[in-house]
Each structure stands twice: as C-alpha cells, then as structure tokens.
Amino acid sequence: MSKPIKIEQGIKYRDADKMALIPVRNVAEEAPKEVLRKPAWMKIKLPSDSKRIQEIKSALRKNKLHSVCEEASCPNLAECFNHGTATFMILGAICTRRCPFCDVAHGRPLPPNAEEPSHLAQTIADMKLKYVVITSVDRDDLRDGGAQHFVDCIREIREKSPEIHIETLVPDFRGRMDRALDILQGTPPNVFNHNLETAPRLYRKARPGANYQWSLDLLKNFKEIHPEVPTKSGVMMGLGETKEEIIQVLKDLRAHGVTMLTLGQYLAPSRHHLPVERYVPPAEFDELKEIALELGFTHAACGPFVRSSYHADLQAQGLEIK
C-alpha cells in the first residue's frame, strides 16, 4: 500500500496525485482500457497569430492573476484569448475540492491575496473589457467560502469600469450558503452563475463533496433575493448520463428559477481523470436546445465546445452559441 500524500499548503496537486486523494475509487483504475477517439466535429483549428494570446498571458502573470481558461485546460483558450476575452479565477489557483473531471489543482490554498481585487480591476480596465466573468476555486477553508472576496472584486471592477457587465460563476458555498448570500446581497453581479455540472446520479462519481439539491437551492435562494438578476447554470455531457436525465436536470433548473443554460461536451484533461463515456453529436445538442427553450429558458447555449463562460457576453445577449 502506498503512503498517503501529505498535503502541504500552497502546493498544487494535479493528475495522478490529485486523483489519489479522492476517496471514491472510480477514476483511473476503473477507466476503460481504450480511450475514445475524438470525432471530426471535436477538432479545433488553432489561430495562426498567437500575439494576442501571449499579451493576455503576460498581463495575467504581471498582475499575479489566474484565468480558469489556463488552470482548467479549457479547449477554447486560444479562441477566447485571441479575441481578447478571459474568465478570471480569483482566490488563488488551488481548490479545496478534488472533482475528478476538473483539471484545476487541489491542495491547501494560501490565504486570499488582499491586493487581488485592485490588480484584477486594473487589468480589466487596461484591457477595456465590456463584459467579464469572475469565477473561483472552492474555498472550504474560509468561513464565508470566499463571498467577501467576490464582493471586493466586483466593487473594485465597477469603480474602474463603471459600464462593465459582471458575471460571477460561484462555488456552492457548502455549509455557509446563508452567510455567503447575505454578504453578496448588497453587491450583486449582472448574471449569477453556478454550475450543476451533471445529473444527480453521477454526483458521487463526478462531484464528491457536492450536493445536487444544495446547488439548486443556491440558485433559487439567490434569485429570491435578487429577482432582477438572471441566474445561469452549466451542464456537461459525456460522463455517462442519459438524455432523460439531462432533460430532468433542465426541468429542475427551471423549477428553481434559472433562465440561462449552457450545455457542452466533457473532455478528459488527462488519462488520470474521468474518461469520456460518449461524444455527443451536434444534432443532439441542437435537440436539447429546442427542449430547453420549450421549457422556458430565455438563453440556451448548447454545443460540443460550449463552456459556462464561453462567449458569455454573447450568451447574455441571447445570440446563438455553438
């Protein structure tokens, strides 16, 4: 038997090391021997000019900021960076959770950087962004789950960029929802996003430490406090869910007041993560979009490369995203 890994503060644990820390044994050791080959519709054409990409990466490093685009190995990084957009990840780059679908590092994070809100706001102002998405790692080590840091960032951003629209993609604030919502109450974003990620049957496998109903309640409770702010959620496909399960997730979201939806294809970051069970054809995403609109979603971005913050500004305008 191998010795347990000693988690040291500030150290990133990824891939095999991260998976070894997950109490639910269902990842690499139970993965299929043959990895599914990507179909033609999953091929990405990289931009020929990477100058803008390097400029954004340099700006992030200069201001000691993180993007979820990089930390989560998003397949759309090149496209988004090349168009001058990024989803900023606050509260560090080490997550207290260890979800086996996610490429963000796990470990014991350092205390929040008090200068991050001002650095973030200045970077956004320098980039002249009109729409920005702010997300974070899970911070179960903080009494408010990081809610005050979100508020500090929103305030600083709006002070330097008064016309900007801010979307927050928040964690579930496990065990501290009421406290977090109370803190957020005075400084709400323009869009409040929290991802369900998958069907409830797959939570033990894909989201150990999370609870499906808790996440739904977070979305519902925020909406009750701020009925004027759209709520949004994202779901991955290809983890072993059925079409019927996804439709039920959509119904649950609508029953809890959510009006904005993203559906995208799950891609395994490495062989150590949960394997892709199925590549969902574009036509099936189109069908699910029609179902979502029939259920009452006002915005539904559905397609293989759709991610929660992919072209979030266009999503908010209701434009078609695939």
From Swiss-Prot:
Residues bound to [4Fe-4S] cluster 2: C95, C99, C102
Cofactor(s) essential for the protein: [4Fe-4S] cluster
EC number: 2.8.1.8
Cofactor: binding comment: Binds 2 [4Fe-4S] clusters per subunit. One cluster is coordinated with 3 cysteines and an exchangeable S-adenosyl-L-methionine.
Gene symbol of the encoding locus: lipA
Domain Radical SAM core: residue ranges: 81-298
Paired cysteines (S-S): none
One annotated GO molecular function: lipoate synthase activity
Subcellular location: Cytoplasm
Keyword Metal-binding annotated: yes
Similarity remark: Belongs to the radical SAM superfamily. Lipoyl synthase family.
Enzyme class: transferase
Keywords: 4Fe-4S, Cytoplasm, Iron, Iron-sulfur, Metal-binding, S-adenosyl-L-methionine, Transferase
PANTHER family with a match to the protein in the record: LIPOYL SYNTHASE, LIPOYL SYNTHASE, MITOCHONDRIAL
Pathway: Protein modification; protein lipoylation via endogenous pathway; protein N(6)-(lipoyl)lysine from octanoyl-[acyl-carrier-protein]: step 2/2
Cellular component annotations (GO), alphabetically ordered: cytoplasm
Signal peptide range: none
Catalytic activity, as annotated: [[Fe-S] cluster scaffold protein carrying a second [4Fe-4S](2+) cluster] + N(6)-octanoyl-L-lysyl-[protein] + 2 oxidized [2Fe-2S]-[ferredoxin] + 2 S-adenosyl-L-methionine + 4 H(+) = [[Fe-S] cluster scaffold protein] + N(6)-[(R)-dihydrolipoyl]-L-lysyl-[protein] + 4 Fe(3+) + 2 hydrogen sulfide + 2 5'-deoxyadenosine + 2 L-methionine + 2 reduced [2Fe-2S]-[ferredoxin]
Residues bound to [4Fe-4S] cluster 1: C69, C74, C80, S309
Name this protein carries in UniProt: Lipoyl synthase
